[in-house]
Amino acid sequence: MEHSQPNSMPQDLSEALKEATKEVHVQAENAEFMKNFQKGEVTREGFKLVMASLYHIYDALEEEIEHNKENPVYTPLYFPEELHRRAALEQDMAFWYGPRWQEAIPYTQATKRYVRRLQQVGRFEPELLVAHAYTRYMGDLSGGQVLKKIAQKALDLPSSGEGLAFFTFPNVANATKFKQLYRSRMNTLEMTPEVKQRVLEEAKTAFLLNIQLFEEVQELLTQDTKDQRPSQASDIRKRAGSRVQDSTPVTTPRGKPQLSVLSQVPLIRWVLTLSFLVATVAMGLYAM
């Protein structure tokens, strides 16, 4: 009986990932912020912040993927034409921030934490990169499509898809079939049981990075509901700003300036928008 314990883990990596992340799936599914997003409570100003955060995250992820594209621990999952989002997000940045978007986009503390982890994995633990690629791209191909429709309606965006290039995968003809292909490729990766367990733990870390963001947003939301008087608006922005500016040195993707835009947007819009960011991950991954 004691020898049956190792066999309790699903043999296929894709199934093992699904099983290992069930608990964090539930946490994300039951998050209060989901109700806000499902009601379409997203503003244009806030959505810009969401897209900027996604740009930083995918810029870091895909830079590390490029560094490891010939590494056997990742090569079978290298689908730049079908999946990579950086070019699409650059289009979205130009739409939302204008031609000088690289000088204008914000870089929040929660995003920095995510980027730091991606850089660490890509450079020192590339065998774990599959966990981040799987959770992000498969989520984008699933629940991300639902979020696109909600955002398009809530923000009254053009039906042509301007400002939403991130959600469009022109080189994926059938999302369901492609996800099946991706999972089958994942299952061909050779790894020891020890490495496999680390991959599963890293997938949980990817979820937890977003749950931490949710907790931060909830705290700011609680503070904002307690401080509604105009005379206190400056103090609220200062509290929020202290959370966005991270004193810890960090490598900025492509050397972009780390500019805060919180002073330009009402806090409540910022809070609701960050909720949208976490909702993208939570809903997208749960749909897998």
Swiss-Prot record:
Q: Which positions form S-S bridges? A: none
Q: Where are the transmembrane segments?
A: 266-288
Q: Which UniProt keywords apply?
A: Apoptosis, Endoplasmic reticulum, Heme, Iron, Membrane, Metal-binding, Oxidoreductase, Phosphoprotein, Transmembrane, Transmembrane helix
In terms of InterPro entries, this protein maps to: Haem_Oase, Haem_Oase-like, Haem_Oase-like_multi-hlx, Haem_oxygenase_CS
Question: In the record, which positions carry Phosphoserine?
Answer: S242
- GO biological process assignments: apoptotic process; cellular response to arsenic-containing substance; cellular response to cadmium ion; erythrocyte homeostasis; heme catabolic process; heme metabolic process; heme oxidation; intracellular iron ion homeostasis
Q: Where is this site: Important for catalytic activity?
A: D140
Topology class, membrane: Single-pass type IV membrane protein
Q: Which reaction does it catalyse?
A: heme b + 3 reduced [NADPH--hemoprotein reductase] + 3 O2 = biliverdin IXalpha + CO + Fe(2+) + 3 oxidized [NADPH--hemoprotein reductase] + 3 H2O + H(+)
Compartments where located: Endoplasmic reticulum membrane
Q: Which residues lie on this side of the membrane: Cytoplasmic?
A: 1-265
Q: Return any one Pfam family short name.
A: Heme_oxygenase
Give a short account of its post-translational modification: A soluble form arises by proteolytic removal of the membrane anchor.
Q: Which domain of life is it from?
A: Eukaryota
Q: Where does heme b bind?
A: K18, H25, Y134, R183
Q: How does it assemble?
A: Homodimer and higher order homooligomer. Oligomerization is crucial for its stability and function in the endoplasmic reticulum. Interacts with FLVCR2; this interaction is potentiated in the presence of heme.
Name of the molecule in the record: Heme oxygenase 1
Which organism encodes this protein? Sus scrofa (Pig)
Upper lineage is:
Eukaryota, Metazoa, Chordata, Craniata, Vertebrata
